[in-house]
């Protein structure tokens, strides 16, 4: 089993830890908890770069090795990094578990060394009709991020 972790933080007070596990060539399970967010849905994505030299802005676009349009996690035509939304409670926290087959921890499309990003707004899953729907899901600014690193 391969394991990875990302510790999220931001200048806006958002914190969290996200764990990634993958058994063999199976899907990757993503579990985590976040705090300090406004209640409601927040876009949640793996971005292409593990560069936080300019905060979350330097993490690049959504991880998209197949050059697809933005979409929902269940869509076949989607960025590999499109993980949908996390639903934050009234207390500003969320715990979640996601299983996804497009974000492996090994191989040529590994997400190790890339960033995971939480956005200010909900991801419209490419279906919102906004000019940004097919690229970012119109999910707004980047409120927290962390680099995905191998875990022992």
Swiss-Prot record:
<comment type="function">
    <text>Destroys radicals which are normally produced within the cells and which are toxic to biological systems.</text>
</comment>
<feature type="binding site">
    <location>
        <position position="70"/>
    </location>
    <ligand>
        <name>Zn(2+)</name>
    </ligand>
</feature>
<feature type="binding site">
    <location>
        <position position="62"/>
    </location>
    <ligand>
        <name>Cu cation</name>
    </ligand>
</feature>
<keyword id="KW-0049">Antioxidant</keyword>
<feature type="binding site">
    <location>
        <position position="82"/>
    </location>
    <ligand>
        <name>Zn(2+)</name>
    </ligand>
</feature>
<dbReference type="InterPro" id="IPR018152">
    <property type="entry name" value="SOD_Cu/Zn_BS"/>
</dbReference>
<keyword id="KW-0186">Copper</keyword>
<dbReference type="GO" id="GO:0005737">
    <property type="term" value="C:cytoplasm"/>
</dbReference>
<dbReference type="GO" id="GO:0005507">
    <property type="term" value="F:copper ion binding"/>
</dbReference>
<comment type="subunit">
    <text>Homodimer.</text>
</comment>
<keyword id="KW-0862">Zinc</keyword>
<feature type="binding site">
    <location>
        <position position="62"/>
    </location>
    <ligand>
        <name>Zn(2+)</name>
    </ligand>
</feature>
<feature type="binding site">
    <location>
        <position position="79"/>
    </location>
    <ligand>
        <name>Zn(2+)</name>
    </ligand>
</feature>
<keyword id="KW-0963">Cytoplasm</keyword>
<keyword id="KW-1015">Disulfide bond</keyword>
<feature type="region of interest" description="Disordered">
    <location>
        <begin position="62"/>
        <end position="82"/>
    </location>
</feature>
<feature type="binding site">
    <location>
        <position position="47"/>
    </location>
    <ligand>
        <name>Cu cation</name>
    </ligand>
</feature>
<protein>
    <recommendedName>
        <fullName>Superoxide dismutase [Cu-Zn]</fullName>
        <ecNumber>1.15.1.1</ecNumber>
    </recommendedName>
</protein>
<feature type="disulfide bond">
    <location>
        <begin position="56"/>
        <end position="145"/>
    </location>
</feature>
<dbReference type="InterPro" id="IPR036423">
    <property type="entry name" value="SOD-like_Cu/Zn_dom_sf"/>
</dbReference>
<feature type="compositionally biased region" description="Basic and acidic residues">
    <location>
        <begin position="71"/>
        <end position="81"/>
    </location>
</feature>
<comment type="similarity">
    <text>Belongs to the Cu-Zn superoxide dismutase family.</text>
</comment>
<feature type="binding site">
    <location>
        <position position="119"/>
    </location>
    <ligand>
        <name>Cu cation</name>
    </ligand>
</feature>
<feature type="binding site">
    <location>
        <position position="45"/>
    </location>
    <ligand>
        <name>Cu cation</name>
    </ligand>
</feature>
<keyword id="KW-0560">Oxidoreductase</keyword>
<dbReference type="GO" id="GO:0019430">
    <property type="term" value="P:removal of superoxide radicals"/>
</dbReference>
<dbReference type="InterPro" id="IPR001424">
    <property type="entry name" value="SOD_Cu_Zn_dom"/>
</dbReference>
<dbReference type="InterPro" id="IPR024134">
    <property type="entry name" value="SOD_Cu/Zn_/chaperone"/>
</dbReference>
<dbReference type="GO" id="GO:0004784">
    <property type="term" value="F:superoxide dismutase activity"/>
</dbReference>
<dbReference type="Pfam" id="PF00080">
    <property type="entry name" value="Sod_Cu"/>
</dbReference>
<keyword id="KW-0479">Metal-binding</keyword>
């Amino acid at each position: 089993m391969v394991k990875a972790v990302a510790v999220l933080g931001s200048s806006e007070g958002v914190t969290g830890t996200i764990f990634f596990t993958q058994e063999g060539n199976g899907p990757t399970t993503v579990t985590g908890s976040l705090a300090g967010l406004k209640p409601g849905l927040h876009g949640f994505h793996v971005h292409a770069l593990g560069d936080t030299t300019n905060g979350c802005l330097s993490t690049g676009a959504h991880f998209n090795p197949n050059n697809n349009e933005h979409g929902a996690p269940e869509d076949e035509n989607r960025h590999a990094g499109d993980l949908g939304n996390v639903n934050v409670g009234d207390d500003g926290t969320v715990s979640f578990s996601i299983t996804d087959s497009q974000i492996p921890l090994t191989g040529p499309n590994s997400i190790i060394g890339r960033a995971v990003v939480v956005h200010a707004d909900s991801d419209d899953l490419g279906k919102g009709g906004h000019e940004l729907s097919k690229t970012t899901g119109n999910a707004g600014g980047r409120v927290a991020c962390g680099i995905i690193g191998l875990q022992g």
